[in-house]
């Protein structure tokens, strides 16, 4: 992680007050761009939620969430989902690279009409997975909780994508990989962006 942080470019800006330097992500945050890059976990979720809440200070302007994620922890993803819905500023989502599992869940949770993917993006939907060791009675409790989570996520996919619960229940039974075109057909996104001119906000 430390080596990766050292590779983050710095941007230098000149102003009447002198010279200021920013890491590239902080500079993009000033343009209301947030990156979800890599695994979804508690640390990443906390950072994204904090940035969403910070940018809500100007609720009339959209926030752009760029996603390139293989997915990860359901609870961490749901924290970001709930924060996206909680704040007043609209959140536009864009998949660049891949949006799998919780990554695709957050992609489809963007503002209706403002969910997009780049042409060669890969999207994956599937049911949540989990594991637990312990007493048989406790394992049954955890199994019931996973089933409840599956039902809740299936319902949310269906609501956001304008399809039936049964469609997503069947679609998520096993790993389902999608191209950008297939994600468009399923309603996870509304647009496939090839050049910047396709949108004024992303």
Curated annotation (Swiss-Prot):
Domain of life: Bacteria
Biological processes annotated in GO: protein quality control for misfolded or incompletely synthesized proteins
Active site positions, chain numbering: 101, 126
An example Gene Ontology CC term for this record: endopeptidase Clp complex
Cell compartment(s), UniProt: Cytoplasm
UniProt keyword annotation of Protease present: yes
SUPFAM superfamilies xref list: ClpP/crotonase (SSF52096)
Keyword NAD: no
Pfam families cross-referenced by the UniProt entry: CLP_protease
Record note on quaternary structure: Fourteen ClpP subunits assemble into 2 heptameric rings which stack back to back to give a disk-like structure with a central cavity, resembling the structure of eukaryotic proteasomes.
Record-given protein name: ATP-dependent Clp protease proteolytic subunit 1
